């Protein structure tokens, strides 16, 4: 049987891994200037868009928080997988 403590530890490891991966891909999203964010976003996420289109997108999305969205998705997927493991072990 899998203990809740082990499930929690596994979840924390996955979130830490996800954060590390995220920060290695998008270090400029934390405390960076808008031009740099625009350039990196364009390279990583919107290669077919112009700089102005990416900047317009950022200006239209003031509440956009890719880190929060990524963590929510990772947490959901981790919970699903760990829940399945717990159920199988039980």
What feature does the model see in each segment?
Residues 7, 11-25, 39-42:
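N-terminal acidic leader/helix
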Residues 21, 88-90:
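Residue-level recognition of conserved structural "scaffold" positions that shape functional pockets
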Residues 3-4:
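Short, charge/polar-rich alpha-helical segments
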Residues 26-88:
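Acidic, low-complexity, intrinsically disordered interaction modules
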């Amino acid at each position: 049987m899998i203990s809740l403590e082990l499930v929690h530890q596994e979840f924390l490891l996955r979130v830490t891994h996800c954060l590390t991966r995220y920060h290695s891909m998008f270090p400029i999203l934390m405390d960076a200037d808008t031009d740099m964010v625009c350039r990196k976003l364009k390279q990583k996420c919107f290669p077919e868009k112009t700089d102005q289109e990416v900047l317009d997108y950022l200006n239209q999305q003031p509440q956009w928080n890719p880190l929060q969205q990524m963590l929510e998705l990772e947490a959901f997927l981790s919970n699903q997988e760990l829940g399945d493991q717990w159920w199988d072990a039980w």
